[in-house]
């Protein structure tokens, strides 16, 4: 219990940091709203606003028309959120890096915050470095680099998250250390991971924590904590945002699933590209029930595979965390199924199942481990493809999952009905209830798949109502062709080629997509999922 309390405390810090990363006015707006709610004679209205804040992780909501609008008195968020100066655009960054190539590594680091070189910013960073000597010790040369920067508001520089968020990360480390001390004898591997990850938060180098996380034997509890995913960076698509997930392992389901993970090399070798790699015959796959999620992880997140770092994955592998009480939740699945049934012809409506969703999701996560990891010239995909990197990587993983399905059927992982359910969920995944915004990589790549599938005859309008028919006999051929294109883009690392590909397949026709979206809106009971946790205050 002591360890859990400490881990939850660390998670709350990740939540606050994430909200701070998203919007500079978020925390003040939340505090004001809390005070209004406490003082309200009739708290229903403020309670509704608190629910909105909780659902959208800040003071900006997504409307039913997919617009982003503040619902508290705050400004609109910047594309780069608070990780870049307000008003900074990509051309200015590109120009700056062309004239200051030595700044490239720090400006483009996934865990750095970009600032303008004002006297106030530089003085504040140096003062914080004085206040947190532990950060200075873990970042040799940082002080000298900051002192060497000339004051120039037109110039840019970057500081590590460890300095920008030193007070919060120092406190989070203390909580992780205390949790580790409480479980040292019971689960030494988990304790070692917590010690390492606490240090990682302040060093910015996650290798020690990643290594002990992926290779350790933890027992019942697991914790994902730190800054990994960059989906919220709509400027460059490279900055990582904070999250935490406290998870309880379902041992029986985990063992059954691990026994099935035996054909990874065969699945890798079957992918439609020439540059195959050796993959580990076993990767840690765990089925968990979510105890609490924080920050970017909060919501109906079904699964995760980490670490993202290609070098860490090569050396230590990756860990897959399946969130069973989200993925297998009957109410959530029923809402998903309603969307599918609203747009497919009657004879296809029973093809979707919870098991099909589970398997497609599982192999999507494993798909991140397979295929291209770095470009032909050795660059990371994030560096090469920038704001398109997440979109292309997520599409690759969707397609790897579908491409693997026939192999899974051949080895007896599931039967013909299981294969069909896996495929049906692949179509369900592409359905959109509104037109995606340009900064929504998940929804955009789903729409692109739908359009490719439609143009290549995998799905087509059926009957007078123009409901969708699924041509299962075309499935593997069409998926293979699209996956081949995606792998080619990743290997080439060509930004302009990738942009042309996205522009080609990212389109919306109200007569087709709009009509299907209307059918979904008419049938779906809910447009969002508000996830609450029994162990938390949930506001």
Q: Where are each of the predicted segments found?
A:
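N-terminal helix-rich structural modules
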Residues: 1-185, 189-193
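Contiguous, non-catalytic segments that form substrate-binding/exosite surfaces or channel walls
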Residues: 158-349, 353
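An active-site-proximal "capping" alpha-helix that borders the catalytic cofactor pocket
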Residues: 187, 390-407
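Short, glycine/acidic-rich hinge or "gate" loops at secondary-structure transitions
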Residues: 188-195, 278, 379-381, 410-425
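Active-site recognition of the HExxH zinc-binding catalytic motif
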Residues: 356-373, 397, 402
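Post-HEXXH active-site segment of zinc metalloproteases
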Residues: 372-395
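Long, well-structured alpha-helical subdomains associated
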Residues: 402-498
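Extended, compositionally biased alpha-helical segments that mediate assembly or anchoring
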Residues: 487-539
């Amino acid at each position: 219990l002591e360890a859990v309390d400490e881990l939850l405390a660390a998670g709350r810090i990740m939540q606050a940091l994430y909200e701070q990363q998203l919007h500079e006015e978020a925390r003040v707006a939340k505090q004001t709203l809390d005070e209004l709610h406490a003082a309200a004679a009739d708290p229903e209205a403020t309670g509704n606003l608190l629910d909105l804040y909780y659902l959208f992780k800040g003071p900006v909501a997504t409307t039913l028309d997919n617009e982003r609008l503040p619902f508290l008195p705050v400004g609109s968020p910047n594309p780069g959120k608070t990780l870049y100066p307000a008003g900074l655009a990509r051309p200015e960054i590109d120009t700056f890096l062309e004239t200051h190539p030595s700044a490239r590594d720090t400006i483009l680091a996934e865990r750095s915050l970009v600032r303008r070189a004002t006297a106030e910013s530089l003085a504040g960073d140096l003062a914080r470095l004085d206040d947190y000597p532990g950060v200075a010790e873990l970042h040799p040369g940082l002080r000298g680099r900051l002192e060497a920067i000339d004051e120039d508001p037109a110039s840019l520089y970057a500081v590590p998250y460890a300095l920008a968020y030193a007070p919060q990360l120092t406190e989070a480390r203390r909580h992780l250390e205390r949790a580790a001390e409480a479980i040292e004898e019971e689960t030494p591997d988990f304790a070692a991971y917590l010690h390492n990850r606490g240090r990682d938060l302040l060093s910015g180098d996650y290798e020690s924590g990643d290594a002990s996380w992926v290779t350790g034997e933890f027992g019942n509890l697991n914790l994902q904590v730190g800054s990994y995913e960059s989906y919220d960076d709509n400027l460059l698509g490279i900055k990582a945002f904070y999250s935490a997930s406290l998870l309880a392992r379902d041992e029986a389901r985990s063992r059954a699933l691990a026994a099935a993970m035996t054909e990874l090399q065969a699945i890798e070798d079957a992918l439609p590209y020439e540059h195959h790699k050796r993959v580990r015959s076993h990767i840690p796959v765990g089925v968990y029930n979510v105890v609490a999620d924080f920050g970017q992880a909060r919501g109906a997140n079904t699964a995760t595979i980490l670490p993202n770092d290609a070098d860490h994955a090569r050396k230590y592998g990756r860990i897959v965390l399946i969130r069973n009480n989200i993925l297998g939740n009957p109410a959530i699945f029923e809402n998903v199924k309603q969307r599918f049934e609203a747009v497919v012809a009657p004879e296809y409506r029973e093809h979707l199942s919870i098991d099909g969703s589970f398997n497609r999701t599982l192999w999507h996560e494993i798909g991140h481990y397979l295929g291209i990891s770095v470009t032909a010239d050795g660059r990371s995909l994030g560096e090469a493809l920038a704001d398109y990197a997440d979109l292309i990587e997520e599409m690759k993983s969707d397609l790897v999952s579908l491409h693997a399905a026939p192999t899974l059927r051949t080895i007896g992982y599931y039967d013909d009905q299981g294969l069909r359910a896996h495929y049906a969920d692949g179509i369900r995944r592409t359905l959109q209830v509104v037109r995606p915004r340009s900064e929504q990589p998940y929804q955009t790549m789903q729409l692109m798949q739908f359009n490719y599938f439609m143009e290549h005859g995998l799905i087509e309008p059926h009957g007078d109502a123009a409901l969708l028919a699924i041509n299962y006999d075309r499935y593997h051929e069409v998926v293979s062709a699209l996956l081949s294109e995606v792998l080619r883009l990743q290997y080439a690392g060509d930004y302009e080629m990738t942009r042309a590909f996205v522009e080609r397949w990212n389109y919306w026709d109200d007569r087709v997509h709009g009509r299907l979206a209307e059918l979904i809106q008419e049938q779906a009971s809910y447009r969002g999922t508000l996830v609450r946790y029994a162990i938390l205050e949930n506001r």
